[in-house]
Amino acid sequence: MKLHELKPAKGAVKEVKRKGRGRATGNGKTAGRGHNGQNSRSGGGVRIGFEGGQMPLARRLPKRGFTNIFAKVYNEVNVDVLNKFEDGTTITPEFLKEMGVIKQIEKNGVKILGNGNLEKNLTIKAQKFTKSAAEKIEAAGGKAEVI
């Protein structure tokens, strides 16, 4: 097969329906909109969620829960992710953002979790550490410092 022999997949190319271009086209006069009514008008149609006057689903279902404005939000980083850094590196939230480990620093900072194993000797500065994370960091010869 050569470049000039390529053809689109069957059913991939549809013929354009030119609407309102005479009765012989099959899309003339009303252009596929049926006869009079709200949907035949320009800009016609009902708003999203409108169910013809019936009580909409969003209002039939009860409200549930709330958002706690005092919730503490942390970036959670597991210790096994930190293996990719060199021995003796000092790791801070800003450093993690710079290296692309986290996208942005959350309002309460970074929490280091203890999932996986740490083989590197690192100094890690973060807002919170789990017990297992702190133990693994110190077992590898590093330091876990709370900022």
UniProtKB/Swiss-Prot annotation:
Part of the 50S ribosomal subunit. This is Large ribosomal subunit protein uL15. Keywords: Ribonucleoprotein, Ribosomal protein, RNA-binding, rRNA-binding. Pfam families: Ribosomal_L27A. Residues 1-15 have a biased composition (Basic and acidic residues). GO terms for biological process: translation. Gene3D superfamilies: 3.100.10.10. Binds to the 23S rRNA. One of its GO terms (molecular function) is rRNA binding. Residues 1-47 are annotated as: Disordered. The keyword Ribosomal protein applies. Residues 23-35 have a biased composition (Gly residues). GO terms for cellular component: cytosolic large ribosomal subunit. InterPro entries: Ribosomal_uL15, Ribosomal_uL15/eL18, Ribosomal_uL15/eL18_sf, Ribosomal_uL15_bac-type, Ribosomal_uL15_CS. The keyword Ribosomal protein applies. Belongs to the universal ribosomal protein uL15 family.
